[in-house]
Amino acid sequence: MDSDNVDESVGMLDLKTKFDVFIENGDKNLEMDTGTRATTVPNTPTSDTKNSNSHSSVSPLRSFSRRSGTGSSVGSTAGKTNLSPQLLTPVRLNEGEHPLKDIPSANGSNVKSKSNNKSKRRSLIQPITAPISPDHHGNNFSSAGPVASETRKLSGHQRVISNTSMHSRRSSSQSIMNDVSQDGSLGISSLLQSLASKELELLETKQRIEDLRRQLASEENAYNQGALELKSLKEQVSSYLNPTTFGSNNNNHSIQIADGQDYVIDSTTNELIPTISRAESETKLNIPKSSNSISSGNSKIHSRALSNLSPKQEEGQEDEANESIWSKSLSMFTRLDQIIQQEVEKSLNWESSPEPTASTFAPITEEPGQYYDQNSNSFVRESSRQQNSHNSSEANDNSYSSRSIWNFVSEVKTGLLGKPDDELKGSKPQINTKTDSLEFSNASDDANDSPTIEYNIKQFKTRRKVTGDVEVENSSSKLRDVSIGDNVEEDDNENRIRQVNNRRKVVEMIDFN
């Protein structure tokens, strides 16, 4: 049956081509259309097929050079192999085998396998390849082979749509710019699309920047809270490490720590001391308000040093010792500087100005209340005399400041010698005008019990105010004698009394200046 069918097919080669014969035979036997399938036809049957089907004849292999060309039949010989240049349909060797079955040939090394052969037919559904990154956009299309060449024939608008559907806005905008640079100018639609993608990209960047700013602000707030918590923990740890400093008031100090109270660790005693205001420190240490706050920290140190040098005394005496010269502030040194400056300026002014003489002002008898100045040859009225008396009061104040400097010097000396203040309590400094020395007299004790303490400290060369009647009379002798007539009357007596009073005033004025 098979040989008859083969013979009939060979006879019909003149009327039809061999290709059409194979297709028709395959369609009739399998009842299916094999026009779209791509297979290879083995040129020679296998050895197994020869052994099993030795009685059956093998269908010959035919090759066609052209569509219209005539074909030549080739016998079924095992040594000859021919490859078909065109797509062929497999031949069914026997009734039990399927025509699409993969039958290996005897010379398998010379014949290509089914996986190596590719179909020359192209499907209408072509795959669209997308680049992995924007940088390799052009390389992926160039490596796509014939598919890339076919896609380049499409319009630019379709290519832009296919690319933007697979990529993000940034990659799509870059791909559009690459296409514009490669293919030249695109349409208005592609330009508008690139514009929109660029705007969206900028909006996303701006939103990302705002998110980073909000995140930065939240991180800063978290850092500040952490710093406050760390500070409170440090203060709590320091309070627990030094329980003797706080004593029974540990809870109160912990509350103050939570409220934000600041503490200072003393380097000498390693104690945690809470900071207090200036008013509280002045009230606790009994320091006047005019004093400087620097002395409040140094008072304890000096008091401890003095207590170590001196023998131990009772508690009442220690409290009195704390009120020594060292408990006072540094304003005392400032006061000393001011007093010395005043004394120096005053001494310089005295050295530069000439001393007034007794003949500068001479009383006259022409008009009461007037004086004659010999230097300026003019009259001086009562107003100028009052001004001179005001200057004399200022000189009195300066003399008082000269006494205050010696008071300060004596206090400093007693502090340096380490003598307690109770020895000098109630004592008032007095200036001995005869010896020019400074003396202290105790007013609380009797004169017999406590002797007078005398310090041979020389006084500055300052002019002293003379108020004694004896010195006034001696200085009045320097004035001119006024001739008084022999005839003494009541008017002359009144003038004489007025002249004596005026002389005393002039002498006092000269001494003050």
Curated annotation (Swiss-Prot):
Residues 62-76, 161-180 have a biased composition (Low complexity). GO terms for cellular component: cytoplasm. It holds the Pfam family TDA11. Residues 26-180, 347-400, 417-450 are annotated as: Disordered. Residues 36-60, 78-87, 349-362, 372-400, 429-450 have a biased composition (Polar residues). Keywords: Coiled coil, Cytoplasm. Its main location: cytoplasm. It is found in: Cytoplasm. Residues 190-240 form a coiled coil. Belongs to the TDA11 family. This is Topoisomerase I damage affected protein 11. It comes from Vanderwaltozyma polyspora (strain ATCC 22028 / DSM 70294 / BCRC 21397 / CBS 2163 / NBRC 10782 / NRRL Y-8283 / UCD 57-17) (Kluyveromyces polysporus). The gene is TDA11.
